[in-house]
């Protein structure tokens, strides 16, 4: 099976929680699955924290912004690769994509009433983008994964969904990069 994994931001130097979830998930898949063929779809970045292997290929997609990368670059690349499945790891996905989709929905804070006013323009635009995209892709997903039972219950309650539509997968178990008592 050919599986594409969207991991747009894993090569950026300053990673966020979702980036670590994607990175560690991919590293674990790389250790245990030698049968399927994987295409890790990334943006260019300084931190080459993942290496290719026999069945795992890194595909760099170069677009100037997150929305253009996801809505134009990613679907264009998928047409070339022709994967059997796409896993989008960071809450959003292409609006027009014919590849069967699995989505990791970490939280839905962007759908809730905004708290505070100290957001940068970048954060405000990102929030608007997610508020537009996420409701439009959820029904297209073959499976939705979230990272805790608490968030699963919250998503189901907020969106009035049946719990069976969402799977909890405790993905990230690596030591915190800020924790001096642990080592890799």
Residue ranges and their predicted role:
Residues 1-174:
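Carbohydrate transferase catalytic cores enriched for Leloir-type hexosyltransferases
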């Amino acid at each position: 099976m050919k599986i594409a994994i969207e991991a747009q931001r894993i090569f950026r130097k300053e990673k966020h929680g979702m980036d670590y979830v994607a990175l560690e998930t991919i590293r674990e898949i790389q250790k245990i699955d030698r049968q399927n063929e994987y295409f890790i779809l990334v943006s260019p970045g300084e931190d080459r924290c993942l290496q290719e292997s026999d069945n795992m290929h890194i595909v760099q997609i170069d677009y100037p912004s997150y929305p253009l990368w996801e809505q134009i670059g990613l679907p264009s690349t998928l047409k070339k690769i022709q994967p059997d499945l796409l896993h989008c790891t960071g809450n959003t996905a292409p609006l027009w994509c014919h590849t069967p989709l699995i989505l990791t929905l970490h939280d839905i804070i962007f759908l809730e009433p905004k708290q505070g006013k100290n957001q940068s323009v970048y954060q405000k635009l990102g929030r608007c983008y997610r508020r537009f995209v996420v409701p439009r892709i959820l029904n297209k997903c073959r499976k939705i994964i979230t990272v805790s039972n608490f968030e699963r219950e919250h998503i189901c309650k907020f969106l009035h969904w049946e719990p069976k539509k969402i799977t909890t997968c405790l993905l990230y178990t690596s030591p915190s990069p800020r924790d001096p008592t642990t080592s890799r």
